[in-house]
Curated annotation (Swiss-Prot):
Residues where Mg(2+) binds: E43
Keyword Protein biosynthesis found: no
Subunit structure: Homodimer.
Main location: cytoplasm
Organism listed in the record: Danio rerio (Zebrafish)
Catalysis: reaction(s): ITP + H2O = IMP + diphosphate + H(+); dITP + H2O = dIMP + diphosphate + H(+); XTP + H2O = XMP + diphosphate + H(+); N(6)-hydroxy-dATP + H2O = N(6)-hydroxy-dAMP + diphosphate + H(+)
Entry's Gene Ontology cellular component terms: cytoplasm
Biological role: Pyrophosphatase that hydrolyzes the non-canonical purine nucleotides inosine triphosphate (ITP), deoxyinosine triphosphate (dITP) as well as 2'-deoxy-N-6-hydroxylaminopurine triphosphate (dHAPTP) and xanthosine 5'-triphosphate (XTP) to their respective monophosphate derivatives. The enzyme does not distinguish between the deoxy- and ribose forms. Probably excludes non-canonical purines from RNA and DNA precursor pools, thus preventing their incorporation into RNA and DNA and avoiding chromosomal lesions.
Subcellular localization: Cytoplasm
Entry protein name: Inosine triphosphate pyrophosphatase
Cofactor(s) annotated in UniProt: Mg(2+); Mn(2+)
Amino acid sequence: MAVPTGRALVFVTGNAKKLEEVVQILGDKFPYKLISKKIDLPEYQGEPDDISIQKCKEAARQVDGPVLVEDTCLCFRALEGLPGPYIKWFLDKLKPEGLYKMLAGFEDKSAWALCTFAFCAGKEEPVQLFRGITEGHIVEPRGPRDFGWDPCFQPEGYDKTYAELPKEVKNSISHRYRALAALSEHFCQDNGAPETKRSKHQD
């Protein structure tokens, strides 16, 4: 099932700031009109790719059309990748300060942020995955507290946290930017027919 250029693509999120950031990163060249929709999806468990695929399939079933689903992981090297895909619950309970304190007993404060966008053209269609990773460190929270764990993640090569960086700077280096760049390049090259060139990451 091809998705014609200009057709609406449902981005599954209830987070206005996330939608704003995604639209800003994608820019005018992205061939679809992005529409946000909050959908109640099961809280899947497992490896990041498996979670993304399951969520995207369920969203496509509910929407009965093309959907885009995002999953974000924050992975601490000292904890062998945890919290990983469960960062949402850790953040809800601990806040950025608590995430920082989790590594108090470890010398290694390094971490990586992983963003996975899953696209599905419709029910029964394969899921394509686009990933982005940004390396960094977990630091004592600094900056505005209005966007998740941004205050405690300092990207490699910068002396400011995600929260302290100007939006245009963050949006040019973030894990979300890298994943969206891969997605946008894939769709723009395919000129509105994402199914004609399969990603190797499909189910």
